[in-house]
Curated annotation (Swiss-Prot):
Protein name as catalogued: D-serine/D-alanine/glycine transporter
Cellular localisation: Cell inner membrane
Record PROSITE patterns: AMINO_ACID_PERMEASE_1 (PS00218)
Domain of life: Bacteria
UniProt topology in membrane: Multi-pass membrane protein
Record InterPro entries: AA-permease/SLC12A_dom, Amino_acid_permease_CS
GO molecular function: symporter activity
Endpoints of the signal sequence: none
A Pfam family hit: AA_permease
Length: 470
């Protein structure tokens, strides 16, 4: 794959079918931060808090710890060969063409499914202000807007993600500061609840639902981290990947502590975990509970922006994956063509059309949170597959190309050991998904995707990939 796709610097005249390196360090850092603050944090944290109580803090820390090492593996691999434009490329190079095919199409499907969840979330957030608003109106408006803006240039995507991420950062930092002030002032809500850190351990301790509740929090919590690997799809369009990628990946632990741990501590200090409504976003409900409806509208705008940001990332990454797959000969040739602005326009349009499946999902499952849970479970499973492929690629890389590892400027710490630890953790999460009815249904449906992919590779992909290599 890496021989088929070329990238050029911004100041060079682009050859036909070449991606341009238009994303600066500023874009990459904010894309990484925005990817780490997903819809799952805003939309799914209500359910995870109700399932696990304060122990959900440890759930997010554990998942974040594991994914940091997955990202370190991805970073070392991408920088070992700057012709790699994404993890689909090194999977194809190290594991074989089948791996690039499965990874590329699965990642495309991951983001389409995630985009559907974002459409569901956007619909819910829009109904906060307009209870009678049609699901179709809210969804179509956002999808058309994202399509139009992404058709412009890759730099436009970078700018959109920059400002989307800035809104999320300002909102979460503001929430943390306001929450800390409330705790310091012993603020009392209209219901008589006094803000206090003691809520974290006084109402049943750190593990009020026991180990079963603690384990139940992992499914939606995993979904909150999807998109953390997004910087890996920008490698071919980054001006200085050797500096930008390590900086973005190394900041992951700080982002997790700041945006996940601190925000959840504040939420459960102001609003006792037992009072959190699983069907609603606790970020919005926190301000409603303390009698600040105007602030609740602002936060609702922020979480709506977060969902739009996630959908924006999905539209970007899926179009790039389709472009790479088409270059490999395992996707329709039309997706391999770029517009005059070096944007894979046909891939963008196709992915946006697929996002409308989120609206269909709402009609199949009228419960917003029910539809969100089903979609996010499928997404979490597929993302774990992609993360596992990254780890497997790293193990093969260490075995077959030890000289590249020795020369690497960005070695993964505890490389081989942590690969196995992370994969064991993903198996553990899959086992947990069998415990709940709604997640079990999604777990049973997911293999159908891999069966369809396998048949596609057997009858079409394998032959086309071989012809292209000749």
């Amino acid at each position: 794959m890496v021989d088929q796709v070329k990238v050029v610097a911004d100041d060079q005249a682009p050859a036909e079918q070449s991606l341009r390196r238009n994303l600066t360090n500023r874009h990459i850092q904010l894309i990484a931060i925005g990817g780490a603050i997903g819809t799952g944090l805003f939309m799914g944290s209500g359910k995870t808090i109700s399932l696990a109580g304060p122990s959900i803090i440890f759930v997010y820390m554990i998942i974040g710890f594991m994914l940091f090492f997955v990202m370190r593996a991805m970073g070392e691999l991408l920088l070992s060969n700057l012709e790699y434009k994404s993890f689909s490329d090194f999977a194809s190079d190290l594991l074989g063409p089948w791996a690039g095919y499965f990874t590329g199409w699965t990642y495309w499907f991951c983001w389409v499914v995630t985009g559907m969840a974002d459409v569901v979330a956007i619909t819910a957030y829009a109904q906060f202000w307009f209870p009678g608003l049609s699901d179709w109106v809210a969804s179509l408006s956002v999808i058309i807007l994202l399509l139009v803006l992404n058709l412009a240039t890759v730099k436009m995507f970078g700018e959109m993600e920059f400002w989307f991420a800035m809104i999320k950062i300002v909102a979460i930092v503001s929430l943390i500061v306001v929450g800390l002030v409330m705790v310091a002032m012993h603020f009392q809500s209209p219901t008589g609840v006094e803000a206090s850190f003691a809520h974290l351990w006084n109402d049943g301790g750190w593990f009020p639902k026991g180990l079963s509740g603690f384990f139940a929090g992992f499914q939606i919590a995993v979904f909150a981290f999807v998109g953390i690997e997004l910087v890996g799809t920008t490698a071919a369009e980054t001006k200085d990947p050797e500096k930008s990628l390590p900086r973005a990946i190394n900041s992951i632990p700080i982002r997790i502590i700041m945006f996940y741990v601190f925000s959840l501590i504040v939420i459960m200090s102001v609003t006792p975990w037992s009072s959190v409504v699983p069907e609603k976003s606790p970020f919005v409900e926190l301000f409603v509970l303390v009698g600040l409806p105007a602030a609740a509208s602002v936060i609702n705008f922020v979480v709506l922006t977060s969902a739009a940001s996630s959908a924006n990332s999905g539209v970007f990454s899926t179009s790039r994956m389709l472009f790479g797959l088409a270059q490999e000969g395992v996707a329709p040739k039309a997706f391999a063509k770029l517009s005059k602005r070096a944007v894979p326009a046909k891939g963008l349009t196709f992915s946006c059309i697929c996002l409308l499946g989120g609206v269909v999902m709402l009609y199949v499952n009228p419960s917003v949170i029910g539809a969100f849970t089903m979609i996010t479970t499928v997404s979490a499973i597929l993302f774990m597959f992609v993360w596992t492929i990254i780890l497997c690629s790293y193990l093969v890389y260490r075995k077959q190309r030890p000289h590249l590892h020795e020369k690497s400027i960005y070695k993964m710490p505890l490389g081989k050991l942590m690969c196995w630890v992370c994969m064991a953790f993903f198996v553990f999460v899959l086992v947990l998904l069998t415990l709940e009815d709604d997640t079990r249904q999604a777990l049973l449906v997911t293999p159908l995707w891999f069966i369809a992919l396998g048949l596609g590779w057997l009858f079409i992909g394998k032959k086309r990939a071989a012809e292209l290599r000749k």
